[in-house]
């Protein structure tokens, strides 16, 4: 009777931390294949904090149009005095 009683294997499994599962499928069979998949895929429970992705923006990769200010992009949108005089000269020549 000096022999210590070992707990049941089911109780050992309950207290063991969940092993990571690398299965990426969300079908019904894969969602119920283990406890971790059921919690994550079936119920949508996440116990880890998801990291937000950093913006990996460098000056070389950005579009030059987006870097310019609004006034710079639309600078040729309005007529100028030089444009008016050229049009008037062309009209007077006809």
From Swiss-Prot:
Keywords: Activator, Host nucleus, Host-virus interaction, RNA-binding, Transcription, Transcription regulation. The keyword Transcription regulation applies. It comes from the Viruses. Residues 58-80 have a biased composition (Polar residues). GO terms for cellular component: host cell nucleolus. Residues 38-48 are annotated as: Core. GO terms for biological process: positive regulation of viral transcription. It is found in: Host nucleus, Host nucleolus. Residues 21-37 are annotated as: Cysteine-rich. A motif (Nuclear localization signal, and RNA-binding (TAR)) lies at residues 49-55. Residues 51-94 are annotated as: Disordered. Residues 81-94 have a biased composition (Basic and acidic residues). GO terms for molecular function: RNA binding; RNA-binding transcription regulator activity. The keyword NAD does not apply. Disulfide bonds: none annotated. Interacts with host CCNT1. Associates with the P-TEFb complex composed at least of Tat, P-TEFb (CDK9 and CCNT1), TAR RNA, RNA Pol II. Interacts with CCNT2; the resulting complex is unable to bind to TAR RNA. Belongs to the lentiviruses Tat family. Transcriptional activator that increases RNA Pol II processivity, thereby increasing the level of full-length viral transcripts. Recognizes a hairpin structure at the 5'-LTR of the nascent viral mRNAs referred to as the transactivation responsive RNA element (TAR) and recruits the cyclin T1-CDK9 complex (P-TEFb complex) that will in turn hyperphosphorylate the RNA polymerase II to allow efficient elongation. The CDK9 component of P-TEFb and other Tat-activated kinases hyperphosphorylate the C-terminus of RNA Pol II that becomes stabilized and much more processive. Extracellular circulating Tat can be endocytosed by surrounding uninfected cells via the binding to several surface receptors. Endosomal low pH allows Tat to cross the endosome membrane to enter the cytosol and eventually further translocate into the nucleus, thereby inducing severe cell dysfunctions ranging from cell activation to cell death. Through. This is Protein Tat.
């Amino acid at each position: 009777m000096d022999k210590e009683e070992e707990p049941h294997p089911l109780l050992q499994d309950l207290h063991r931390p969940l092993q990571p599962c690398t299965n990426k499928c969300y079908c019904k069979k894969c969602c119920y294949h283990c406890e971790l998949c059921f919690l994550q895929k079936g119920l949508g429970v996440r116990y880890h904090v998801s990291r937000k992705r950093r913006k990996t923006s460098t000056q070389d990769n950005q579009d030059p149009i987006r870097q310019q200010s609004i006034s710079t992009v639309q600078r040729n949108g309005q007529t100028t005095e030089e444009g008016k005089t050229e049009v008037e000269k062309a009209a007077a020549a006809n």
